[in-house]
Structure formats: structure tokens, C-alpha cells
Amino acid sequence: MVKIFIDPGHGGSDTGASANGLQEKQLTLQTALALRNMLLNEYQNVSVLLSRTSDQTVSLTQRTNAANSWGADYFLSIHMNAGGGTGFEDYIYPGVGAPTTTYRDIMHEEILKVVDFRDRGKKTANFHVLRETAMPALLTENGFVDNTNDAEKLKSSAFIQSIARGHANGLARAFNLSKNAAALYKVQIAAFRTKANADSLAAQAEAKGFDALVIYRDSLYKVQIGAFSSKENAEALVQQAKNAEFDTFIYQE
């Protein structure tokens, strides 16, 4: 059993970065909850614990103590950035070697495959959550809330889902997680070779009330609006999508 500890940065009285109508503490929690659901619903032999599951104040020491006491195999701290930049970057503790560096390289690559952010690079820092954890640890900074372009992306629930998906893909690859045997019925409305086209259609679907997710697989950006264990539920969503004038089909995976 692989034990993944997910740390949504900030929370409660600690808002984190705030700009353009966004609060970091809300974005990190949304991303972490989506990531947890992906891992637990889609993969075998993985256990997930979050440092917080609501808007509560949790100290840095409480976060690392919880991960250490639980015996986590990996500590993942999710953040959004501020300070005038743009894009994605991640951090590990200075001077550490494998497997921390190996996991970081995989996570960095998989996140940027599906998240439309500029690559700001792989960095090191003496952050508490990287220093005081007894297992490999990574802190990701997913866009700048004070950058207009980044902020517009972060306001989209579909984009938050894509951030979570990138993290999930990275964890699955880093820890060789196996997919659940039970196939899901997935509802897809399109597939594109360019991410911009997929993001545009996802935004259109979201505007019509669908939960859209852009997934990069088989060299295509696929726009998915649902995944179900029941084929009947998938077919019901297909009809809703067709009524909204989307070309839709179901596939199993």
C-alpha cells in the first residue's frame, strides 16, 4: 500500500496569496480534494491522507507531524504563487538525492504535460514541509494569482481539475500505481492535438453546466465530462450533452 500525504497549503486564518478575486487557500483545497478522489477512485493499493479537508488553520508543524506519524511514503504540498511572475515551479529540499529527485522529475514532467503553464523550472528551498518530513517531499506552485492570465485559468474548475490530473498522473507513474480493474464508462465530447482547442471546448461545456476535464492521453487532449461505473448514468449524461449540442460518445477505461 502506497501512502500519499497531500498538503493543501494555507487555510483558515492563513489565506495565502490573494489577488484577482482568488484566495490561495481555496484553490489548494479544491486541487487536493480532486487529487484525492482521482487517486482513490482510479488506482489500487493507494492510501491518501490530507493535512486538512476544510477551511481550517493547520500549523506547519502539525502538517509534518501528521505525515511522519502516519508513515507516509510521499509528502506533496500544493500551493499557488504570487509576486509578479507566471507559470509552474516546484521545490525539493536542497542537497537531497534519489528517490526525491527522481519523483520530482516525474511529477514536474507529468504536470506540465496537462497544465497550460510556463515552466519556471525545478528548484530547491529550505521550506519547513520539505525539511521536517521524514519521507521524500515535493512542494508545487501552480500559477500566480496576481498574474491576470494565470488567474483567469485558475478561476476555471476544469483547469483546477487538470492541475489535479497532472499531479495524479505523476504520482501514478512515480509509484507504479495500478489502475482499478473495474472499468469506468467515460463520456467524451472531443479530442484535439492542441491543448488550446481542448481548453476552449472545456470552457464552453463548463459554461453550460458540465464538469469538464482535459486529459492528455495517446498524444491527444481529450475533453471528458463524466466517468461512471454505471453505463446507464453515462448514457444519461450523453443525452444531456447532445441536448446541449455537443458531439458525445462513451468509452470504457
From Swiss-Prot:
Q: Which family does it belong to?
A: Belongs to the N-acetylmuramoyl-L-alanine amidase 3 family.
User: Which segments constitute the MurNAc-LAA domain?
Assistant: 4-172
Which stretches are sequence repeats?
A: 184-219, 220-253
Q: What is this protein called?
A: N-acetylmuramoyl-L-alanine amidase CwlM
Region 2 X 35 AA approximate tandem repeats: list its residue ranges.
184-253
Give the originating organism. Bacillus licheniformis
From the UniProt record, list the reaction(s) this protein catalyses.
Hydrolyzes the link between N-acetylmuramoyl residues and L-amino acid residues in certain cell-wall glycopeptides
Q: What is its main location?
A: secreted
UniProt-listed SMART domains:
Ami_3 (SM00646)
